[in-house]
Structure formats: C-alpha cells, structure tokens
C-alpha cells in the first residue's frame, strides 16, 4: 500500500506540486495498480523459458561497403559558409 506521504515525497523529488487531496487520490490509485501487478506473483511460470527480447533478432547489421563519395568542392558548394576547406557551423556555446 502506498501512503499519501510517499506520493508527496515522489512529487517533491519530481518537482511536481501535489495537493493533499490529490496525494490521497494518487495513493489509492497507485496502490490498486501495484496490487494488480502483484497478481503476476501468483502465475505459474514453471517450465516457461524467460523472454529477454520480444523478437529473437540479435544485432542485425549490414555489411560495410566502401563507395565513392562526393568531391570536397561539391560538398562545400552546398553549404552557406566554409573556412579552410571545411563546413563552418554556428557556435553553440
């Protein structure tokens, strides 16, 4: 059972202002959700293989293929600003 104080504490941690009435309401609702999840403890999972991923696909990567790229002049022709053969981007900090 989640208490009103625990809800208020979590609200404080998340910097969310929760009123007393709301905290009481959330405590009841969250407790019912946790009770619902508690039903999973009663399910017989004997002999059931654990599921680590929904799909059995593991690290599907494509082969790296070396292809010709654009010429530096063509790339720099498409940029607003360039300096010393490089694309000049705006300062962020």
From Swiss-Prot:
Q: Does the keyword Ligase apply?
A: yes
Q: Which GO terms describe its molecular function?
A: asparaginyl-tRNA synthase (glutamine-hydrolyzing) activity; ATP binding; glutaminyl-tRNA synthase (glutamine-hydrolyzing) activity
Q: Does the keyword Nucleotide-binding apply?
A: yes
Enumerate the catalysed reactions: L-glutamyl-tRNA(Gln) + L-glutamine + ATP + H2O = L-glutaminyl-tRNA(Gln) + L-glutamate + ADP + phosphate + H(+); L-aspartyl-tRNA(Asn) + L-glutamine + ATP + H2O = L-asparaginyl-tRNA(Asn) + L-glutamate + ADP + phosphate + 2 H(+)
> Per its UniProt record, what InterPro entries does this chain match?
Asp/Glu-ADT_sf_sub_c (IPR036113), GatC (IPR003837)
Any idea of its EC number? 6.3.5.-
Keywords attached to this Swiss-Prot or TrEMBL record, sorted alphabetically, are:
ATP-binding, Ligase, Nucleotide-binding, Protein biosynthesis
- The main enzyme category here is ligase
GO biological process terms, semicolon-separated: glutaminyl-tRNAGln biosynthesis via transamidation; regulation of translational fidelity; translation
* Similarity comment text for this entry: Belongs to the GatC family.
Q: How does it assemble?
A: Heterotrimer of A, B and C subunits.
Q: Summarize the protein's role.
A: Allows the formation of correctly charged Asn-tRNA(Asn) or Gln-tRNA(Gln) through the transamidation of misacylated Asp-tRNA(Asn) or Glu-tRNA(Gln) in organisms which lack either or both of asparaginyl-tRNA or glutaminyl-tRNA synthetases. The reaction takes place in the presence of glutamine and ATP through an activated phospho-Asp-tRNA(Asn) or phospho-Glu-tRNA(Gln).
The protein's name is Aspartyl/glutamyl-tRNA(Asn/Gln) amidotransferase subunit C
Q: In the UniProt record, what gene is named as encoding this protein? A: gatC
């Amino acid at each position: 059972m989640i208490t009103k104080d625990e809800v208020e504490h979590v609200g404080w941690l998340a910097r969310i202002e929760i009123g007393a009435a709301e905290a009481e309401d959330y405590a009841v609702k969250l407790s019912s959700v946790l009770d619902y999840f508690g039903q999973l403890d009663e399910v017989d999972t004997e002999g059931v293989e654990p599921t680590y991923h929904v799909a059995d696909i593991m690290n599907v990567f494509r082969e790296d293929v070396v292809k010709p790229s654009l010429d530096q002049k063509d790339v720099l022709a498409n940029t607003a600003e360039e300096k010393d053969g490089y694309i000049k981007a705006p300062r962020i900090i």
